[in-house]
């Protein structure tokens, strides 16, 4: 079972200065880091926040509007996201949107490189098992659920009012009782309803909903039952995590009336789930949490351009403004007598490592991979099939497009937040 580690670490920025970060990392059973986020303790992330934004200008030839969510921050809004938008101020009844209009928007992508943050008018209210959407008013069900499960949820949820909102049933829903899912949907309904009622009392640039800290959001987005324990060595963070799970971090002892800190809690099992979650405050003066999980060395490896494979081959990752290029090198381990088998074996090993690195480093956008040339077409088919299987484990939408005539493999990975590399860039 995986564990989530949340700690502090000083990391060298690209200008060589050290800065303190909150490191939230997912580790597998073998204590291998498989996901990581770096957040400055004082960072105020915009991702997921809902604002009353004001339209600054509309550019029809790129089907976009530029919306201010604060006097200092302008965001990109695609006009394709305006269906069922909730306007608080509408200046034109004939045009879909004009400068001066005010509407509810949600930040769906952080500022990346030279691009402004992106917002959408299709608001999302995410729970553990379902997502309520204000613009897309249909019932969607996770593609990872089987036909029987999809049919069950269509029947179960037909009574919900999809004229006012849409629903997306997450993969995690299959791990809980129907009553738990329905209760969460009712809670999301109420949240959206209250926001619509209260917005008339708010002014432009008001923050209507503030997203949870990155380290809490990352944990919530893990598959149900995939994380057995959340561990931190920061008492303040531990108390925040406990409160997020509805647990007060201080408990009354049986022989006294003064609440005292407790270092570990078992999150009550939700009806219908088999696995529970342990919240742990770690404190050991002889061995820090960072040392126990080799956080610093794992991060150093995650920033290296070249990665060596067990076979002696290597992969090299290079970033450009437009895309990421990954090159697979065979090294000196090719045995001529078994050339075809060796080439396929090295490429399969590289494909597994590349899928791991994309998730670990949060590399997104267009990715071009130059595998070693294979000697048979059927081997190319095997490589692509296995690579797709490895990419399916990534919680972020990742698609293997195809292999080009030049033998380059095209992959796209959805852009949501900064890559690990961009986290170290100075603002």
Protein language model regions, located:
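Extended, charged alpha/beta regions that create polyanion-binding interfaces
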Residues: 1-44, 49, 120-130, 139, ...
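Short hinge/gating elements
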Residues: 133-144, 167-181, 199-206, 225-228, ...
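Flexible glycine-/small-residue-rich
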Residues: 6-10, 15, 26-29, 38-40, ...
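N-terminal assembly/transducer modules of large multi-domain enzymes
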Residues: 52-54, 58-81, 96-107, 115, ...
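Nucleotide-binding motor/catalytic cores of P-loop/tubulin-like NTPases across gene-expression machines
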Residues: 75, 238-240, 247-253, 258, ...
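Loop/turn-to-beta-strand initiation segments
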Residues: 95, 99-102, 203, 362-366
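Conserved glycine-centered short motifs in functionally critical loops
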Residues: 63-67, 111-132, 188, 311-427
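Charged, low-complexity terminal tails
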Residues: 1-120
């Amino acid at each position: 079972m995986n564990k989530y580690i949340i700690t502090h670490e000083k990391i060298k920025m690209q200008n060589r200065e050290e800065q303190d970060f909150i490191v939230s990392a997912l580790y597998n059973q073998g204590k291998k880091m498989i996901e990581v986020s770096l957040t400055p303790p004082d960072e105020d992330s915009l991702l997921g926040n809902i604002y009353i934004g004001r339209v600054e200008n509309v550019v029809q030839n790129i089907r976009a509007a530029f919306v201010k969510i604060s006097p200092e921050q302008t965001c990109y809004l695609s006009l394709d996201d305006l269906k069922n938008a909730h306007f608080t101020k509408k200046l034109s009844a004939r045009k879909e949107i004009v400068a001066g209009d005010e509407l509810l928007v949600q930040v769906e992508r952080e500022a990346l490189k030279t691009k402004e943050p992106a917002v959408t008018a299709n608001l999302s209210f995410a729970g553990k098992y379902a997502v309520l959407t204000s613009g897309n008013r249909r019932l969607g069900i996770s593609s990872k659920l089987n036909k029987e499960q999809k049919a069950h949820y269509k029947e179960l949820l037909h009574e919900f009012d999809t004229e006012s909102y849409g629903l997306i049933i997450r993969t995690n829903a299959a791990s809980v009782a129907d009553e738990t899912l329905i209760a969460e949907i009712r809670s999301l309904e109420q949240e959206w309803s209250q926001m619509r009622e209260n917005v008339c009392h708010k002014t432009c640039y008001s923050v209507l909903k503030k997203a949870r800290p990155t380290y809490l959001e990352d944990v919530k987005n893990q598959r149900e039952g995939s994380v057995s324990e959340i561990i931190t060595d920061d008492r303040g963070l531990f108390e925040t995590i406990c409160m997020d799970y509805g647990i007060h971090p201080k408990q009354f002892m049986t022989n006294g009336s003064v609440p005292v800190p407790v270092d570990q809690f078992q999150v009550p099992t939700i009806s219908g789930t088999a696995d529970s979650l342990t919240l742990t405050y770690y404190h050991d003066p002889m061995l820090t949490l960072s040392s126990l999980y080799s956080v610093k060395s794992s991060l150093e490896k995650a920033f290296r351009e070249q990665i060596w494979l067990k076979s002696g081959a290597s992969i090299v990752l290079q970033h450009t403004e437009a895309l990421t290029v990954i090159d697979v090198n065979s090294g000196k381990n090719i045995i001529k007598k078994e050339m075809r088998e060796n080439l396929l074996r090295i490429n399969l090993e590289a494909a597994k490592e590349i899928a791991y690195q994309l998730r670990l480093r949060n590399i997104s956008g267009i990715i071009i991979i130059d595998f070693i040339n294979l000697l048979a077409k059927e081997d190319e088919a095997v490589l692509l099939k296995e690579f797709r299987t490895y990419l399916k484990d990534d919680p972020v939408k990742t698609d293997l497009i195809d292999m080009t005539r030049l033998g380059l493999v095209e992959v796209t990975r959805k852009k949501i937040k900064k890559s690990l590399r961009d986290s170290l860039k100075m603002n």
